[in-house]
Structure formats: C-alpha cells, structure tokens
Amino acid sequence: MTEMSIIELFEVGTTFESSVGEGTKSERARIPKNYSRIDLPQNMIEEITNIDSEINFLVSGEIWCPDYQLNATVLKKFCDLNTNFNISIITMARGKKFLSPILKIEKEKFKGPTIVVMDKDFNILGFFEERPKTVKENTFEDIKLDYYKGKYLLDTANEILDIIKTHL
C-alpha cells in the first residue's frame, strides 16, 4: 500500500484503551495518574461538553512515549466529557509513512504524538505535535520535571480546544 487517506487511517486505528493495553505495567499505570492530574477549569469543562459538533481525533503515537502518555490522555478526558468526540490511535510507523505526507511534515521531523483534529467529515481543522507550544518555547531541560509531572496538561487542553473553537 503506497497511500492511505485520513479516513482509512482513522478506520484502521485502535481505541485509546487498546493502545494503552499494549504497554508495560508501568506504562499503563501512568495513564490514570496523568488523567487525575488533568485539572480543567469549570468554564473549560462547560465549553467542551457544550460542543455539539462531531469531532474526530486521529493520534499517531505509542504508549511507551511519555509525550503520548501525557497528551493523548488529555484527549481521553475530552472524549469522556463529550460523546460527540471520537478518537483513533495509529502507530508512529503508520503516522510517518501515511500521515506525514497528508500534514506536509517531513518524515524525519514527524514527532509523536501527533494529534489531528478533524470535523465529522474528516476535514482537518488543525494538529498538535508532540508537546504544547509553551513547553517548546522553553529550554526543555529547565522544565522537564514539571512537564513529566503533568504541569502542562492544561496547555495541551487549551491548544486542542483552540483548534476546535477556531472552526466551529
């Protein structure tokens, strides 16, 4: 197979739970810990729950990756808050091979997780790559510990919500 459409990629993907199930015991244990650290303000929770459009999230990432463990868990929270949201997970290899050309990202520069936000017709609204912008704007070594402790999960939530709101 030389190409896959965004819809084919979404359909071949797995659930968040299945992707987590592929991890080691310690990798799996980080998910509920990270989930419990997602402290969304009430107004954001209301914004998310009040979105009445279907939103599809295609994630290229894998459970062994700490960035995936943190940022894909934010999507899980979004999906738990709003049943109009769907999530599908594909491997990094599939993302590099098939998703990177769709997003016009060089394969060598493709990072995980890459989270593609789409409408109900699979039109791409935008994407989030690897870490929130606030983390990328800092010297990673200076904030690494806070990042891995989940102190930037709200930044991820804001970026993803901004992509959705820009297109509603």
Model-derived regions, located:
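Thiol-based oxidoreductase modules, predominantly thioredoxin-like and allied folds used
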Residues: 58-62, 75, 84-98, 118-120
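Local sequence-structure signature of Cys/Sec-based thiol-disulfide redox active-site neighborhoods
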Residues: 46-81
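Secondary-structure boundary elements
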Residues: 81-82, 166
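Non-globular targeting/processing and membrane-anchoring segments
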Residues: 1-54, 101-111, 120-168
